[in-house]
Structures are given as structure tokens and as C-alpha cells.
Amino acid sequence: MRFCVFGFLSLFLIVSPASAWFFPNSTAVPPSLRNTTRVFWDAFSNFTGCHHGQNVDGLYRIKKYFQRFGYIPETFSGNFTDDFDDILKAAVELYQTNFNLNVTGELDALTIQHIVIPRCGNPDVVNGTSLMHGGRRKTFEVNFSRTHLHAVKRYTLFPGEPRWPRNRRDLTYAFDPKNPLTEEVKSVFSRAFGRWSDVTALNFTLSESFSTSDITIGFYTGDHGDGEPFDGVLGTLAHAFSPPSGKFHLDADENWVVSGDLDSFLSVTAAVDLESVAVHEIGHLLGLGHSSVEESIMYPTITTGKRKVDLTNDDVEGIQYLYGANPNFNGTTSPPSTTKHQRDTGGFSAAWRIDGSSRSTIVSLLLSTVGLVLWFLP
């Protein structure tokens, strides 16, 4: 028996072993995924208006959020209560300062709206010192009875200013072999590395050896063994460790868009631009911390439906402080050249997943959308 497929294909799903969803552009994201919620984080909206002195059911969850990103030290690892206490008030004030919000110490609407935005999993505060303010030698000290609010907007570095040693300016990177990525996906990372090498004295080369590469990249779900578990769709998107660790992990549960077509992307609330996240996390791999400059690549959050890949002066100054300037850098950043093959997605939109498991609902949606007509011929 011959099996023939005839139909007008508008969408096509490719399923392969490993773990992540990729879409070539935002129009390939099915309607059912365009308004996916952030699950646990969206519930934080219930705390809008909470302030010091109140006891609100479930408020301990937002304390855990702040602890995850460093605003509450690990020393407060006991059972959190639902009291809006001094510890939470100090955390809220520091968060508001870091993100240039009105410092009220309350969970006002703007603060909650910002908290639920998808973000990098790296902390903003380490050992009581904010990484988002103060530049390379000025720190932003946190006292949990009083928050010092003086700060200077500037790029920041990890504590101790770790960086790749001078004899390692040609770095290799490799993908976890458990993630059989397509060339289109790999090219996204190549472009992201190129944005940093364009401005500084570093070179990046793709390697086939995951075990010996300087930088290792993988897509994982949930608890994947590094103490920084992922949380499903949206929420924390990725994290990377400071030099010379080289570990770069992305959440495989996200809906990753490989080619950012900004106009149509704006209406997609559950898809994330892969290159935008990759450029940010590479900054961490090279030694940059989070910046309070909202336009910078190293700003911790990125809204869905947004593409943000161009380095700002803040990013360039930070990376050149660590490694010096690329002698060919002319003072401006521009997108890497793109081949025609990378620009064109053909006459149809494709989505592919690297995972042995599959989202049956997505498969059925795709099949119903494409208008397939199946003919079985003897």
C-alpha cells in the first residue's frame, strides 16, 4: 500500500528526540500557545496592593521568588510566613530600586507587573550586594533593616570580577549531544556569539566535543542537576554561570522563536526570541552581571513578543573593560550578516521539537490547521 499526503500545508511539525520546542518565526506559533500564562508567577497578581504589616494567604511564595534572585539571603531559609515583614519590605524596596521603579516598599501594581515578566534565572543580588547598580567598583549595599538607595546606572560584573584568562581568547562552545539541534538553531547561537566577538578581543568556535569545550550549551527541564531548576513555560528562561564555568542552560519548555519577525511577534505572548536570550546569557558566560539600564542586553527581564539583540554602550563598555576592544570595532554595533537561506523560511512555517515526548494537543492543532487530506492508495 502506498501512502500519499495531499493538501495545502500552512504548518508542519517536525518531532525529533531530546527536549525543546522551536518555531522558525512567530507566525508558526499555534493560537493555543499565544496566550500561555506564567502559571505560578501570574498568581502573584493576587498580591497587588499588599504592604508592610499585612498577613496575606500565600505571600510566602513571593518571598521565595525574591530569595531565588538574591533579594532575600539564603540564611533566611526557614519556613517563610505570610507576613509582610521587614525582610520582605527591604526586598521589595531593593527590587524597585534595581528596576528603576517608584520605591514604595509595597507590592503596587507596577511592581507586580514587572515581577511576572519572564527573566534570566541568574540572581540580581549576591551576598547582600546588588549586581545591578554601582558599576565595576561601586557596590550597592543591602541592609535588611534599611535599604541604601544611592546607586549609579552602569554595567556590573560578578563579585571578584571573574573573566576568561588572557591565554584563552579563542573559546570553543558545544551543544549537549542529547539535544540534536538543527543547523537553523545552531546558527542563532553563532550570531549571538558574533555580537560579542565583534566588539571585544574574543573568538568563538563551534566544537563537536561537548566534554572538552570551554562553553557547554544545553536545553533542560525542571531540576537538571545544577541547583537552579527551571519552572516550565515562561518564568525563568535560562541561566549561565560566570567564568570559567562555561555552563549555559536554557529551559526546554519554552516556545523558542528562531527567526525574529518583530511585526507579527508583538502579538505572541508565550513565545521567546532565542537569540535575545542567547546574547544575554553569553554576557554572563563572559563575566557580566545584570544591568539596571533597561535598554541594555544585560537587563534581567525580557517581555514576550520582544526581540533585543543589539549591544548598547553599557554592554560594550562592560565587555571591553574585561577583555579589551576588538581592533576592528568602529564604535557602533550592527546585526551580523544573514544569508538568504537564513532569511527565507520558504512557503510554509515549520515547528520542531527535540524531545522524545510530545505535546499531543499541539500536534492535533497543527494537523487541524494545515487542512491535510490523506489519501490511502493501494
Swiss-Prot record:
Summary of activators and inhibitors of this protein: Repressed by acetohydroxamic acid (AHA).
Highest taxon in the source lineage: Eukaryota
Propeptide: 21-154, 350-378
Keywords, comma-separated and alphabetical: Cell membrane, Developmental protein, Glycoprotein, GPI-anchor, Hydrolase, Lipoprotein, Membrane, Metal-binding, Metalloprotease, Protease, Signal, Zinc, Zymogen
Entry-linked Gene3D superfamilies: Collagenase (Catalytic Domain)
Family annotation (SMART domains): ZnMc
Topological relation to the membrane, as annotated: Lipid-anchor; GPI-anchor
Cellular localization per UniProt: Cell membrane
Named cofactor requirement(s): Zn(2+)
E.C. designation(s): 3.4.24.-
Glycosylated residue positions: N25, N35, N46, N79, N102, N127, N143, N203, N330
Primary location class: membrane
SUPFAM superfamilies (alphabetical): Metalloproteases ('zincins'), catalytic domain, PGBD-like
Induction, as annotated: Induced in seedling rosette leaves by methyl jasmonate (MeJA) and cadmium (Cd). Induced in seedling roots by salt stress (NaCl). Inhibited in leaves and inflorescences of adult plants by exposure to cadmium.
pH dependence text: Optimum pH is 7-8.
Short sequence motif named Cysteine switch, residue ranges: 118-125
Disulfide-linked positions: none
Active-site residues, as the UniProt record annotates them: E281
Molecular-function annotations in GO: metalloendopeptidase activity; metallopeptidase activity; zinc ion binding
Tissue spec: Mostly expressed in roots, and, to a lower extent, in flowers, leaves and stems.
Lipidated residues (GPI-anchor amidated serine): S349
Binding site for Zn(2+): C120, H280, H284, H290
Cofactor mode of binding and number, as noted: Binds 1 zinc ion per subunit.
Entry function: Matrix metalloproteinases (MMPs) or matrixins may play a role in the degradation and remodeling of the extracellular matrix (ECM) during development or in response to stresses. Required for plant growth, morphogenesis, and development with particular relevance for flowering and senescence. Active on McaPLGLDpaAR-NH(2) (QF24) and myelin basic protein (MBP) and, to some extent, on beta-casein.
UniProt note: domains: The conserved cysteine present in the cysteine-switch motif binds the catalytic zinc ion, thus inhibiting the enzyme. The dissociation of the cysteine from the zinc ion upon the activation-peptide release activates the enzyme.
Protein known as: Metalloendoproteinase 2-MMP
Lineage: Eukaryota, Viridiplantae, Streptophyta, Embryophyta, Tracheophyta
